[in-house]
Design a protein with these regions (language model features):
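Cyclophilin-like peptidyl-prolyl cis-trans isomerases
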Residues: 1-132
Length: 132
């Protein structure tokens, strides 16, 4: 379990280390190094998702480690309450930023091993705090 403390309340995550071991280990590495301390959810789109993990309170981008392989084809779907890695147009570019799905977002799921179909890797789920 991972605890995210925000100004609005706490969010508890359960990671899917069985199906997405590289992605879960990547996220835990950032957690254990206190990388996420004093970061914020900088992208909030009601009815879609909230994204965080890359910017500090001054809206400055934090330096990250190398990217992690996209394990979306092994993971779960982008449903309400799932936690997925944010990335650029490169399917294997995820580093520290992640998002919580506020709705079922099937269009973000894996569909093919190409740039358009790789999707966004779900590596966990919110088990407490979706209501904050």
């Amino acid at each position: 379990m991972v605890l995210i403390s925000t100004s609005q309340g706490d969010i508890r995550l359960k990671l899917d280390e069985e199906n997405t071991p590289k992605t879960a280990a990547n996220f835990l590495s950032y957690v254990r190094s206190d990388f996420y301390k004093d970061t914020l959810f900088h992208r909030v789109i009601p009815g879609f998702m909230i994204q965080g993990g890359g910017l500090n309170a001054q809206m400055e981008t934090k330096n990250t480690e190398t990217s992690v392989e996209n394990e979306a084809k092994f993971g779960k779907k982008n449903t309400r309450g799932s936690v997925a890695m944010a990335r650029t147009s490169d399917p294997h570019s995820a580093t520290a930023q992640f998002f919580i799905n506020l709705a079922d977002n099937a269009f973000l799921n894996f569909s093919a091993e190409n740039a358009q179909g790789y999707g966004y890797c779900v590596f966990g789920e919110v088990v407490e705090g979706m209501d904050i």
